Amino acid sequence: MRIGQYQLRNRLIAAPMAGITDRPFRTLCYEMGAGLTVSEMMSSNPQVWESDKSRLRMVHVDEPGIRTVQIAGSDPVEMADAARINVESGAQIIDINMGCPAKKVNRKLAGSALLQYPDLVKSILIGVVNAVDVPVTLKIRTGWAPEHRNCVEIAQLAEDCGIQALTIHGRTRACLFNGEAEYDSIRAVKQKVSIPIIANGDITNPHKARAVLDYTGADALMIGRAAQGRPWIFREIQHYLDTGELLPPLPLAEVKRLLCTHVRELHDFYGQAKGYRIARKHVSWYLQEHAPDDQFRRTFNAIEDASEQLEALEAYFENFA
C-alpha cells in the first residue's frame, strides 16, 4: 500500500495510542512486523509544546520506518502550524486525529467531536494539507452517534481536500470502546472513495484480520489495543495473510527478551526516574497471560527503581525455566 510517495512494506499499521505508542513501543512494533507506526497524539496547542511530555513526542529522528505523527486540535491555523513544526522535526507523514472519543479531547472540540461539524473539518483538512509538503492522512470514527453515522460524507470531503489515506474505527464517538466494532460503514466508505482505506477496531487475531480485509475491501488494517503486551501480533497476522497458516505461540524465552528490552528502552527514553513508572503498565499487559493471579504484577508495581524492575523480571522468568 502507498501513502503519497511512500510505499509501506505491508498492510499492517500500529495505531496511535496516547501514553502508549511512544518511540520505544513504535520501534518494537516495527521490529515485530508493523508496516507503519503512528505516534501518540500531539496537541496543536503551542502552549503545551514546552512540557517534557510534548518535547519527547516531538522527537521523530532515529527510529525505523516512515515517521508518522498524529496531531489533534480544532483550530485550523494551529493545526497547520503544528503540522509544519512536526515536519521540520522529521515527520514524513502527518495524521489528523478526528477519531479520539475521550471526553478530555472532545470538550475542546477536537478528536471525534469534529465529525459533527463538516465545515470545520474541511477548514482543518485544507489548512493542514496546504501547510506541508508531505502526505496528510486522517483518522475518524463512523460518526458521532449510532444514529449519526456520517463517515461516507467525511470520507468524500477528505478525498476532495487532498487527504492521502483514511483510517476508520468501526465505532461512533458515543460508543467509546463499548460493544463490538462494525465494518459495514467501513465497507460503504471503501465503495465511495478512491483513496486508501484503513480498517480499525477489534482486530485481535490473524483470522479476524483476514475476515475484516475480505469483508470491507480495506487496503490496510490498523491495530491498537491488541498490540499492547503483544507487539508480535503484527508478525503473526502478516504470516497468516501470506501463508494461511498460524505461527506457533511465541516461546517464553522470546517473550522475556522482548519484554526486558522494552523495559530497558523505556528507562533510557524517559530516564530512570520516570521510566519505571511508564514500564508498569506495559509489563502488566505482557504478563496477562502468564500471571493471571496478579500477584507478581502487584509486587512489580510496588517497585520504584529501574534496575530492581529488571531484576524482578529476571527472577520471574527463572521460575518458568
Swiss-Prot record:
Q: Which Gene3D superfamilies match?
A: Aldolase class I, Putative flavin oxidoreducatase, domain 2
InterPro entries for the chain: Aldolase_TIM (IPR013785), DUS-like_FMN-bd (IPR035587), DUS_fam (IPR001269), DusB (IPR032887), DusB-like (IPR004652), tRNA-dHydroUridine_Synthase_C (IPR024036), tRNA_hU_synthase_CS (IPR018517)
Q: A Pfam family matched by this chain, by name?
A: Dus
What's the cofactor?
FMN
> Which keywords fit this entry according to its UniProt record?
Flavoprotein, FMN, NADP, Oxidoreductase, RNA-binding, tRNA processing, tRNA-binding
Q: Which domain of life is it from?
A: Bacteria
Q: Which family does it belong to?
A: Belongs to the Dus family. DusB subfamily.
UniProt name for this protein? tRNA-dihydrouridine synthase B
* Protein's organism: Salmonella typhimurium (strain LT2 / SGSC1412 / ATCC 700720)
Q: What is the lineage of its organism?
A: Bacteria, Pseudomonadati, Pseudomonadota, Gammaproteobacteria, Enterobacterales
